[in-house]
């Protein structure tokens, strides 16, 4: 069984041409049990993709193809820092999802420079619960191999393998008939032999069917302000970036069957589910780790003393205790603590 683990939807803006419902329907028609979403630098489509998969009985795998800064996410020198590398991150569990959204968010708020970029510092802090693939030709390792710098490629692969762990990092093979991919794949096979890092086969899906390749070309032209037929510098020079069947992928990677088998191995391990309909209140960190309800009681009673003195009317005390008990029973303690945290600076600024 083969699973597509590198897929760009319409939410890879002006790049991906896969409409969610059509994408999932096609995967279902091809007999696929699981499917990933890995849009460029964002997770805008994650919830809609998840719902579309659930409606059609396909297991959704939530992920992202992130942009990794060449130095740190804070560096913004045009010559050195405009370049960036791709990296695939897939959520294995809820911890992985939380780590992924943390990194993607910081890519925008802290690392944005042409693209929302993360860096190795964020990966070191937020790698738990994630499965990592080395990505396409724009990945750090493929780029090193294309530069004929095998030592750098090996050093990079070992760094990621050490960080994510031997069962959470894979070297990604792709073959769309592009000459550069043959060079990269040969290097990846050698790396796998020498380091023991496992291989995985993907197709970097950007459109649902082969005949949709022209639609994706139109998107690229819009993004780069070109017309069809002009050299945009971003065109794929191939019509093979579609949602291929298991049989097509097996034919392409017949020499490395373990790379196909690993897609299903990874898919089985990705078990994150959204919980819709459940109220999730923010978690408030109390001073010294004090019990949340006890801290909330303390703040409320101190507030009553400030307003009514050390001996407030009995009716006021009883009303406060009633309100406190009600808030605790409803599970809203953290909600009220968060409101206090938000409103206090405003109150003091007046």
What is each PLM-predicted segment?
Residues 1-343, 347:
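Phosphodiester-processing cores and adjacent nucleic acid-binding clamps
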């Amino acid at each position: 069984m083969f699973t597509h683990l590198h897929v760009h939807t319409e939410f890879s803006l002006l790049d991906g041409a896969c409409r969610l419902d059509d994408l999932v329907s096609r995967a279902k028609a091809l007999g696929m049990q699981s499917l990933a979403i890995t849009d460029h630098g964002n997770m805008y489509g994650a919830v809609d993709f998840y719902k579309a998969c659930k409606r059609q009985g396909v297991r959704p795998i939530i992920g992202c193809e992130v942009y990794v800064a060449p130095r740190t996410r804070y560096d913004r020198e045009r010559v050195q820092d405009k370049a960036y590398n791709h990296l695939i991150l897939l959520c294995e569990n809820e911890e992985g999802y939380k780590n992924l959204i943390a990194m993607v968010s910081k890519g925008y708020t802290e690392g944005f420079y042409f693209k929302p970029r993360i860096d190795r510092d964020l990966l070191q802090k937020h790698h738990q619960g994630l499965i990592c693939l080395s990505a396409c030709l724009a990945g750090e390792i493929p780029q090193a191999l294309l530069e004929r710098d095998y030592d750098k490629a090996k050093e990079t692969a070992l760094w990621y393998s050490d960080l994510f762990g031997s069962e959470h990092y894979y070297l990604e093979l792709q073959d769309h008939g592009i000459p550069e991919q043959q060079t990269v794949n040969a290097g990846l096979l050698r790396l796998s032999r020498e380091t023991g890092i496992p291989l995985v086969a993907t197709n970097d899906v950007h459109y649902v069917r082969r005949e949709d390749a022209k639609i994706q070309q139109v998107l690229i032209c819009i993004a780069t302000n070109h017309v069809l037929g002009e050299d945009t510098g971003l065109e794929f020079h191939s019509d093979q970036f579609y949602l291929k069947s298991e049989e097509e992928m097996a034919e392409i990677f017949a020499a490395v069957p373990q790379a196909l088998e690993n897609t299903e191995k990874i898919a089985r391990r990705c078990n994150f589910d959204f919980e819709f309909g459940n109220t999730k209140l923010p978690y408030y960190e109390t001073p010294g780790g004090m019990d949340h309800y006890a801290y909330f009681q303390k703040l409320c009673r101190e507030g009553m003393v400030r307003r009514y003195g050390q001996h407030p009317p009995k009716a006021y005390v009883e009303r406060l205790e009633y309100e406190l008990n009600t808030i605790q029973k409803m599970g809203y303690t953290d909600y009220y603590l968060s409101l206090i945290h938000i409103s206090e600076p405003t109150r003091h600024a007046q």
